[in-house]
């Protein structure tokens, strides 16, 4: 009798989950963006929120919860009720690299979230001050090795994608320059313009207007393919440094335990939205490379997070060792 009761209860719960998913969403959904408004992560999150709103018939509202390299907002999302009414638009920094920088993080990127879907990847650019004595990656490496003690590297905060990108570059070259933290990409660019720091690695969109204006030099795109926004800038692979590979993923997650039918409903809406030409243009204007359809789903995103954690952990631990 006891076993029959348990089986019946499990069937009832499964039925409730299915009914919940069938009706979902019935009210406003919060999309946490764990960074301040205005940057690539925020714009990407708003594009995603708009997709969900249009395809699922309820308002998906962005809430910016910045601080500590995106980990404060990510922690809030991890602790939210797993009912589909709080999701997060995160990226490689918050959902792969963060444990290396924050030992008391409070969440596990692999264990505390349900992957929903991969949005895009944003290749990073090595940008240097206008008068930096190098015009390509080979010259940069030679100068950096000979003048390691003089180099100042700017980044947008510990755990940010620019911080990760710079550490990957430094590791590939074998240098440990002075690292100067800022509160975002814009202050880093201002410091490069003013000559206070020598270089930065950041998604293309941040340095782009300064490169186009000729006030900052672009030396390398950190992927296999050139950026359509800067087609004349060669890649790290072309210039013989494939270890400098950094194209942070941007993706959507839900708290662990969110019913799978809800996850699948969100994933389906995201996939449909990413197929729209207008959405593809908006993301391309950010310098993003939209994920191919076979890489977008929950299973593929989960595998990507796992592989990025495995790839980044030894590199970043070594790069940040005293």
Name each model-derived stretch:
Residues 1-4:
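Positively charged n-region of N-terminal signal peptides that target proteins for export
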Residues 7-15:
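Bacterial N-terminal signal peptides
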Residues 20-111, 150-152, 174-199, 203, ...:
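N-terminal (or domain-start) structured segment
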Residues 26-28, 260-322:
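An extracytoplasmic/periplasmic, membrane-proximal ligand-sensing/linker region
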Residues 79-85, 100-187, 236-238, 249-282:
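Hinge/capping helix and adjacent helix->loop/strand transition within the periplasmic-binding protein
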Residues 108-119, 154, 176-180, 198-199, ...:
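Short beta-strand->loop
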């Amino acid at each position: 009798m006891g076993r029959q009761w348990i089986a019946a209860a499990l069937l009832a719960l499964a039925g409730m989950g299915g009914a919940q998913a069938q009706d979902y969403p019935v009210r406003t959904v919060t999309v946490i963006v764990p960074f301040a408004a205005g940057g690539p992560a925020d714009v990407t999150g708003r594009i995603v929120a708009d997709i969900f709103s249009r395809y699922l018939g309820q308002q998906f509202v962005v809430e910016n919860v910045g601080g500590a390299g995106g980990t404060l907002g990510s922690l809030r999302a991890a602790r939210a009720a797993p009912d589909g009414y709080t999701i997060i638009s995160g990226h490689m920094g918050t959902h792969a690299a963060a444990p290396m920088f924050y030992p008391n993080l409070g969440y596990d990127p692999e264990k505390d979230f349900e992957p929903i879907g991969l949005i895009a990847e944003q290749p990073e650019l090595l940008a240097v001050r206008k008068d930096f004595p190098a015009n390509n990656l080979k010259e940069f490496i030679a100068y950096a090795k000979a003048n390691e003690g003089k180099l100042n590297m700017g980044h947008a905060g510990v755990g940010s994608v620019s911080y990760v990108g710079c550490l990957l570059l430094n590791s590939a070259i074998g240098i440990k320059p002075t690292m100067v933290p800022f509160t975002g990409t814009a202050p880093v660019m201002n410091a490069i313009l003013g000559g206070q720091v020598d270089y930065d690695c950041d998604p293309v969109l941040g340095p782009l207007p300064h490169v186009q204006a000729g006030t900052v030099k672009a030396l390398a795109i950190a992927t296999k393919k050139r950026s359509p926004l800067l087609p004349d800038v060669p890649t790290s692979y072309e210039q013989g440094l494939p270890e400098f590979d950094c194209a942070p993923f941007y993706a959507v997650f839900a708290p662990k335990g969110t019913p799978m039918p809800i996850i699948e409903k969100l994933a389906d809406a995201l996939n449909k939205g990413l197929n729209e030409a207008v959405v593809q243009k908006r993301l391309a204007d950010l310098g993003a490379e939209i994920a191919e359809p076979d890489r977008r789903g929950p299973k593929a995103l989960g595998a990507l997070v796992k592989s990025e954690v495995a790839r980044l952990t030894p590199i970043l631990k070594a790069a940040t060792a005293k």
